[in-house]
């Protein structure tokens, strides 16, 4: 009699990559996008460590601000939790080329990269797309952005004044451009999450 027991693979490197550029300073529901991202990242780190994986941390804006190589166990989570407090908002524009090239060079084995960032439009996102695509050739990448409930509400509400029409058109165009970027990333093998802040 033969019996197979299946176990979930363990000991995978997971890197939480936080963009701390000026777009992540913007508040959503009264809290900065970076703070929402850090809270979600810490929850993911806790669950990953409990599942037996290693967790690392990477913070960047115009340059790399923080790197912790992936480490497992409670010590790994404690270290990520402690050092995530060092992530701070920046007034500088994010340099995806420098940051993601640096991250790729630091990681020796294939892993999961959870990239928490934001972008404004397709033009600004072109350079980001190129670098995320290069990262996705070596690693599994999850691209995470936060939805802006006010923007979605503005695009969906029925306009009553001329100003409302203008705001709705701008909001709808912005949402459409975001959808175009997400679609490009998905075609390139990147998993995308555009999630509400809660």
Label the predicted regions.
Residues 40, 98-102, 127:
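Well-ordered alpha-helical segments embedded in enzymatic catalytic cores
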Residues 50, 54, 90-93, 109-113, ...:
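Intrinsically disordered or highly flexible coil/loop and linker segments, enriched in small
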Residues 75-112:
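Von Willebrand factor
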Residues 109, 123, 127-198:
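Von Willebrand factor type A / integrin I
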């Amino acid at each position: 009699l033969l019996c197979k027991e299946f176990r979930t693979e363990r000991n995978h490197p997971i890197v939480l990559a936080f963009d701390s550029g000026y777009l992540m300073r913007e508040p959503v529901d009264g809290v900065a996008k970076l703070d929402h991202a850090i809270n979600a990242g810490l929850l993911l780190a806790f669950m990953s460590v409990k599942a037996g994986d290693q967790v690392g941390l990477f913070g960047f804006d115009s340059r790399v601000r923080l790197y912790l190589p992936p480490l497992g166990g409670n010590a790994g989570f404690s270290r990520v939790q402690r050092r995530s407090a060092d992530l701070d908002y920046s007034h500088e524009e994010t340099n995806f080329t420098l940051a993601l090239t640096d991250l790729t060079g630091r990681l020796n084995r294939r892993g999961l990269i959870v990239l928490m960032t934001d972008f404004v439009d397709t033009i600004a996102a072109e350079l980001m797309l190129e670098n995320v695509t290069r990262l996705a050739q070596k690693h599994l990448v999850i691209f995470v952005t936060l939805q802006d409930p006010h923007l979605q509400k503005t695009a969906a509400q029925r306009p009553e004044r001329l100003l409302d029409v203008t705001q709705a058109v701008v909001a709808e165009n912005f949402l459409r451009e975001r959808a175009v970027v997400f679609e490009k990333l998905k075609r390139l093998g990147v998993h995308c999450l555009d999630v509400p802040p809660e």
